[in-house]
Amino acid sequence: MADPDLSSPLIHHQSSDQPEVVISIADDDDDESGLNLLPAVVDPRVSRGFEFDHLNPYGFLSESEPPVLGPTTVDPFRNNTPGVSGLYEAIKLVICLPIALIRLVLFAASLAVGYLATKLALAGWKDKENPMPLWRCRIMWITRICTRCILFSFGYQWIRRKGKPARREIAPIVVSNHVSYIEPIFYFYELSPTIVASESHDSLPFVGTIIRAMQVIYVNRFSQTSRKNAVHEIKRKASCDRFPRLLLFPEGTTTNGKVLISFQLGAFIPGYPIQPVVVRYPHVHFDQSWGNISLLTLMFRMFTQFHNFMEVEYLPVIYPSEKQKQNAVRLSQKTSHAIATSLNVVQTSHSFADLMLLNKATELKLENPSNYMVEMARVESLFHVSSLEATRFLDTFVSMIPDSSGRVRLHDFLRGLKLKPCPLSKRIFEFIDVEKVGSITFKQFLFASGHVLTQPLFKQTCELAFSHCDADGDGYITIQELGEALKNTIPNLNKDEIRGMYHLLDDDQDQRISQNDLLSCLRRNPLLIAIFAPDLAPT
């Protein structure tokens, strides 16, 4: 060993033939890649020629495999104190019951007075496309004062504020994280903004009338036309200083405040300056978030607290650069980063669609419903799978009878897809089982299905499969033709097994399989395209 000296490195560099990875950090005005890895890291599972095609049952569609992602370990919709626990909380609840009755009376009286004032302000007002006249806005001050009384009745005797709201002409759009139903009440009192809300809110008793006075922009989250119209209205009202400022909750639903989920882009497409606002609910014994807890239960718990803490922080206005004005995604990322940093929480790819999956799993009485969330924003970005399609995939997965941990084993998987054990069906399962543990999760099932579904050759292959099965060319596949077509991929099929597969592929259940039937079924069960693989590799 050489004698040590002060100038020699402690760890000697060893030469390597492997290329170094150069990481370039992009600032806000650079391209959208964020991090550029040069040279690109090559996945050893991709492009392995004939060996890959042999192992991959979908090699005739693509040489790639679905991305490997870890399990979703966080539930952003979980209320951490759904019930009364501990002696302190029980004693406090009993002591506060008389206070709760007084608060309930104050709540009802404030709601009634605010509702009547709003009805008066709206009486005879027909021109809803223009800003509300000033004298009507002055009447709405009665409703705003009533909303402060409502906050008081819920235990928010004082609310800590940090920073100040920017003037409307500086930041016409305000965005905030969304934890409870309390924030809209607070913002109505504090800012009296125009909000963007779901169409379903219009039918709520009392509340629907009040938000109509805010010249609410309604949106149906499942309608692309409705979303486009909402963006147009946001642009129109943000560009006119006579309208109130606009308030949006870009998460699209409430969370527990422990993470920040993906943002919808409606607030960022217009390209106007945005003021982010952060809301916190510091607590020890009572989580005030509106997650997996009913509204009535949450209201009762609020009524029976001595005081509920709430903090509102107005962050500096975000002025979009010229590139960000043209790129809503970058502006959204910059805003969400500012809010997440202030909250000191991580950002996830969950979205409202994950809440739909969670509610669906709860309705189906599945154990641990949070196992079925998949971070749908990433799924939609990678595979363009909609929330409704994801719920249909969940129905298929549930038919495989997952265990308490949300996992499905081979025999249950095969039964759910009407397959029998054979080399091909096992390779299909192994294609999904990226962890190689002998069981699959819903997230893995969805990613594999979405990966196959979005391959450029998928539709063409489905059409070729129909032509191959329709031996007599009459436009329909008979049960005999199906059995003949499958005998090479799934050998030794008996009549009952062929009949089960035929029933699955007959989408409209009219006892014959048309091309539309097959295409529709394979869109809902894209993994089944592998059983039509022989002689279908398009050139």
Swiss-Prot record:
Pathway: Lipid metabolism; phospholipid metabolism. Ca(2+) 2 binds at D506, D508, D510, R512, D517. Disruption phenotype: Delayed senescence. The double mutants lpeat1 and lpeat2 exhibit impaired growth, small leaves, short roots, reduced seed setting, reduced lipid content per fresh weight in roots and seeds, and large increases in lysophosphatidylethanolamine (LPE) and lysophosphatidylcholine (LPC) contents in leaves. The keyword Metal-binding applies. GO terms for cellular component: Golgi membrane; late endosome membrane. Optimum pH is 9.0. It is found in: Golgi apparatus membrane; Late endosome membrane. One of its GO terms (biological process) is very long-chain fatty acid metabolic process. GO terms for molecular function: 1-acylglycerophosphocholine O-acyltransferase activity; 1-acylglycerophosphoethanolamine O-acyltransferase activity; 1-acylglycerophosphoserine O-acyltransferase activity; calcium ion binding; lysophosphatidylethanolamine acyltransferase activity; lysophospholipid acyltransferase activity; plasmalogen synthase activity. Its EC number is 2.3.1.23, 2.3.1.n6, 2.3.1.n7. It comes from the Eukaryota. Keywords: Acyltransferase, Calcium, Endosome, Golgi apparatus, Lipid biosynthesis, Lipid metabolism, Membrane, Metal-binding, Phospholipid biosynthesis, Phospholipid metabolism, Repeat, Transferase, Transmembrane, Transmembrane helix. Residues 426-455, 457-492, 493-528 form the EF-hand domain. Gene3D superfamilies: EF-hand. The chain crosses the membrane at residues 93-113. Belongs to the 1-acyl-sn-glycerol-3-phosphate acyltransferase family. The HXXXXD motif is essential for acyltransferase activity and may constitute the binding site for the phosphate moiety of the glycerol-3-phosphocholine. The ratio of isoform 2/isoform 1 mRNA is increased about 15-fold in the nonsense mRNA reducing factor mutant upf3-1. Possesses acyl-CoA-dependent lysophospholipid acyltransferase activity with a subset of lysophospholipids as substrates. Exhibits strong acylation activity on lysophosphatidylethanolamine (LPE), and lower activity on lysophosphatidylcholine (LPC) and lysophosphatidylserine (LPS). Exhibits acylation activity on both LPE and LPC. Has a preference for 18:1-LPE over 16:0-LPE as acceptor. Palmitoyl-CoA (16:0-CoA) is a better acyl donor than oleoyl-CoA (18:1-CoA). Among several different acyl-CoA species the best acyl donor is eicosanoyl-CoA (20:0-CoA). Activity is calcium-independent. This is Lysophospholipid acyltransferase LPEAT2. It comes from Arabidopsis thaliana. The lineage of its organism: Eukaryota, Viridiplantae, Streptophyta, Embryophyta, Tracheophyta.
